[in-house]
């Protein structure tokens, strides 16, 4: 049971600090419709436990993309993280009476797919050093461009400067996410021979769900036109040609370029 008296002061701090998280992390605003403080206490306790367990500040030192070393280092870390996460959702449900919560990375790992992560933790642990080093080197330096067709579409739709900026940033984000997914799946195939299929499925499910959340956030605000063709290409259930026609070849070339860069970095393992 969460100690609300102990953490109410922490909640006040969280109002001004904890919510200054990176844009890609979403703690649903709908939580605060009827319970403006209760959910913050649950979240604050969870982040406090994360810091105590892993000696990292969640909002600034934990990364959802790629999967953070703190979570996949070993089975003990995974279970410790998920035990605290399950407590958080129990707090939201029992103390705050919040029965429905949106997708989040920790919810995906610990509530929706814990058994899959647990079964494949050895492979995730073995590949983590490559993901954090080599994959990061590749994915943080990939060539990211906007097609001329989409530049023309933004002009035709009279995008504002802010909308253009958001479009470009979202496209970059999708490129980086897709790169990490491809890279992680590639290294799994090289390192985890016996469990490669299952481990790749775990990674694919995580990244697919992450991208689905990205689209949902834009669509919720009626801004899905800011989701680029490439973003739609790598997001399950989306049509890459919905807003800009004949983008398949361009997106194929983008993905092929990523795959070639990844293969080049890991050629020593071939």
Swiss-Prot record:
**GO cellular component terms, semicolon-separated:** extracellular region
Entry-listed glycosylation sites: 246, 252
Keyword Phosphoprotein part of the UniProt annotation: no
Alphabetized UniProt keyword annotations: Glycoprotein, Secreted, Signal
Tell me which positions the record assigns to the signal sequence. 1-23
Q: Where would you find this protein in the cell?
A: Secreted
Q: Does the keyword Glycoprotein apply?
A: yes
Q: What is this protein called?
A: Uncharacterized protein B0403.3
* Predominant subcellular localization, coarse grouping: secreted
